[in-house]
């Protein structure tokens, strides 16, 4: 999942035509500044959230402080392994050099991984333990969503903070939101 060494895909990425002519058994996408787009004049790179097993949604909520189901609908791929999927998001250019790959765990729960930079994600083809990768939300039907600000802020916080055993997430709320929450 992480390429290193001379001659890897980052030094000489393939065109779509070259990929189709390779005759391989899978296709992956490069993350970070290797896969970019421009939306309304602003540049973005590709990032992903990899939910890795039973309870990974609980790990996400525990660490990030927000239910994973509140993420915007986006292109998503799965390997066929139980409770695993990878969700793709556009990351604003100003975050591309700040955010790093993070593998986050909670005891007795599946982990989740925030993926970017010198990583790639398999999106099609064979998988060693299943019938292969498949789209949960296909790019033919869904756009890749822009990562929500709360996710970017959390990710930036854990990338720039000195290592700590416990990371607490405070969700920034407006005065109106706090009043509404307290009136329930």
Over which residues does each language-model region extend?
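Conserved phosphate/metal-binding and DNA-contacting active-site motifs used
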Residues: 1-180
């Amino acid at each position: 999942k992480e390429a290193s060494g001379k001659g890897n895909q980052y030094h000489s990425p393939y065109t779509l035509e070259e990929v189709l002519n390779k005759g391989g058994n899978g296709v992956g996408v490069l993350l970070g500044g290797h896969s970019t787009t421009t939306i309304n004049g602003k540049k973005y790179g590709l990032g992903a959230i990899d939910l890795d097993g039973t309870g990974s949604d609980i790990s996400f909520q525990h660490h990030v402080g927000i239910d994973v189901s509140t993420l915007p609908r986006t292109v998503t791929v799965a390997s066929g392994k139980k409770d695993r999927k990878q969700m793709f998001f556009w990351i604003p250019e100003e975050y591309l050099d700040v955010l790093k790959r993070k593998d986050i765990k909670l005891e007795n729960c599946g982990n989740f991984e925030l993926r970017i930079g010198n990583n790639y994600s398999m999106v099609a083809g064979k998988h060693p333990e299943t019938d292969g990768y498949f789209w949960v939300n296909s790019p033919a039907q869904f756009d890749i969503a822009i990562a929500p600000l709360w996710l970017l802020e959390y990710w930036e916080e854990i990338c720039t903070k000195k290592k700590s055993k416990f990371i607490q997430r405070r969700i920034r709320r407006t005065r109106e939101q706090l009043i509404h929450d307290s009136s329930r």
